[in-house]
Amino acid sequence: MPPKTLFPLVPACDAAPRKKRLAVALLAVPGLVPAVSQAQLSGAAAEPQAFGSPWDLRLAPQLDEHPQKQGGKPATFVLADHTNGTAEQDLAAKGAAEIRRGNAAVKADAIHYDQDTDMADAYGKVTVANGGTTFSGPEAHLKVEANQGFMTTPKYRFTATGGTGSAERVQLLDSERSVFTNGTYTGCQCSTNPAWYIKGSEFDFDTGADEGVARNGVLFFQGVPLFGSPWLTFPLSGDRRSGFLPPTFSPFSSTNGFELSLPYYFNIAPNRDLTITPHIISKRGIFTQATFRYLSTNYSGTLTGEYLPDDRVAHRNRYAIFWQHQQNFGNGFGGYVYYNKVSDNLYPEELGSTNQFVNGVQTVYQQEAGLTYNNGPWSVLGRYQHWQTLPPSAAPYGREPQLNVKYTKYNVGGFDFGAEADYSRFRITTADQPEGDRVMFNPYVSYGLYGPGYFFVPKAQLHMASYDLTTTTGGVPGQPKRFTYSIPTLSLDTGLVFDRSVRLFGQDFIQTLEPRLFYVYTPYRNQSNAPLFDTAVSDFGLAEIFTPNTFVGNDRIADANRLTAALTTRFINPTTGDERARFVIAQQYYFTDQRVTLLPTEAPATARHSDLILGASVKLGAGFASETAFQYNVDNNQLVKSSVGFGYSPGERRVINVGYRYTRQNPTLSNEPINQILMSAQWPLTRRLYAVGRLNYDLASSRVVDGLVGFQYDADCWAFGVGVQRYANGLNSSGQQNSSTRVLAQLVLKGLTSIDNGLVTAFRAGVQGYTPLPPAPAPLSRFSNYD
């Protein structure tokens, strides 16, 4: 076989002698590849780095691309087994023929090329490549540099986005735009029998704009038509594009009947978008939702509006507004807005979003705007806070307005000191509840002594509060409306740290032994006249026993003369410093009775010591971890509260969680007893099929509080999931918990769209450690299939 012939052609205006044309063409090679819109190194970073010897090869940090100079014309190269023709006019090439000009390449069994018109006619196993797009078919007729022409029965691939397909004919408009007649498109990498594809009478593709348009398009999945439209637009890379999103359909319900929604997405700008979703609710009418999202360097937010005119069931207009905004004014100043409002009490139950199934039906809506300032030791908050409360929830107090100032300074000659000042005007929508103003000032100072094996921190603080009430509880005669409290608190926090090297289960550890004492003294002050604006009883656990006040909020300061004793031991990996296990035991000892109570009708506590608190956390190999906590009443020999949890996660999408929660009923606190088992998991059944589930079972009532079971299947270019969820749905007329069931589903056509009515959201909320299925792999680089 004769060797292939390299036959360079140069533009006719070039007067270089014939024997110099090869050299001229070779010198033009660096200009063949056009510039691309990607980040390029510059300066010294882009220079090749030499090895030690001057004769060594050099490492280039990037693929260097040289754009064609403006006004310059790239050389044309022809490669074939046999060539003949007239120089500077035309050329016939046969046998593995190739023509290259700029970044365009044409390959075929035979090519006829006319240099004057730059027209190439290719026959037999034709491949046309330009700008990362490849077409193949039996014949093609096009201008090489302009990439203008047509091709019959082509197959195509967009290398940059991964899209493929075929058609009866393609009209090439330029290097980015093309029109296909009676064709198909898919994002699947397989060239035959793709799982999903779009079939249309005509396709308009624009790789520069990342957009495809199908006329009379029908979306097929596994050979079954899912959706059809006379005008169907879609992104070629899966990025955001304006257009219709997949419709969603909800099965019949007694509340709303059938529901059908068809969202339209407006990609306004890279940092702004708008989604308008009309819902057809068979029993109520047309319900419209609009969500506007915006993001900038100094602000971001989401605004959602919902409107149902003339509800055919409720016989009134119904609406909802949800607005979240964050603002950075610079120099430490900021601001925010949270405004949420619904038209009526039944709105969240009848027209609420799918998030209510995860978090329960929302009955309290925050309406708040504030300004903030943070700079060094200073922190300032000014806000106006109001609440819309729906029955049966109890309305919280709003701060209308509030000004809070904090100052904190650390290690000034060994001292830590600071103060918090707060003014709040409390208002509430519930009748016969006290309202008024409260001014609070809380300075403190502490001095810490720290060493390698000890710490000793005395602290003094003062709580001052002044009230000016406009109304009192029930309007009791003689109850004061103006009064002031001043309550000091002294505390001492000290502890030691011992450590030793031990060997357990064949492994070396550093074991610590950490005794800790925390003493608090606060004198008694009668605070029964103060309303409960923001105060409640603090929980009793390892996180709360080292705080001076047994209440949270500023309306009650507990009198105290108590000592908290705790002992902690840790087992630490000496090489990595990772804590593998921790065990804690703690108890409080009361030297006097605590007389301050949350409500005046409550009896003071007279116990000499608290319940015993025990906690443990263990991390073993292969992803196993455990967290346990117990509250035990030694006097009554009763378990008051317990929480036991185990987690096992040996790898990605492999997690099993088992937990148990128990809380004994306490008549003095009117708490609900808890005796529940919780289990959740995500685990692969096969290489592609995953099971996901959650169960919260109440042992006392022998019922499922909430449950979720589902499956997810991950294929190469699509994914499918289905689940059934049982969830709490408020209380019935007898005061018992209602439960409802719903079916969840998800279909992901990778590279095109996703349809999901809440499946992934439910999996995330229900299974700790849940990992979603992976997205479609990134498309290959345009250099991967270089022709």
UniProtKB/Swiss-Prot annotation:
| The protein, known as | LPS-assembly protein LptD
Subcellular compartments: Cell outer membrane
The residue range of the signal peptide is: 1-39
Is Signal included in the keywords of this UniProt record? yes
Species: Burkholderia mallei (strain ATCC 23344)
Point out the gene that encodes the protein: lptD
**Pfam families linked to this entry:** LptD
UniProt entry keywords in alphabetical sequence: Cell outer membrane, Membrane, Signal
Tell me a GO cellular component: cell outer membrane
Give the matching InterPro entries. Answer: LipoPS_assembly_LptD, LptD, LptD_C
Q: Which family does it belong to?
A: Belongs to the LptD family.
Q: What is its main location?
A: membrane
UniProt cross-references to HAMAP family, sorted A to Z: LPS_assembly_LptD (MF_01411)
A single GO BP? lipopolysaccharide transport
According to its UniProt entry, the function of this protein is described as: Together with LptE, is involved in the assembly of lipopolysaccharide (LPS) at the surface of the outer membrane.
- Assembly description: Component of the lipopolysaccharide transport and assembly complex. Interacts with LptE and LptA.
Superkingdom of source: Bacteria
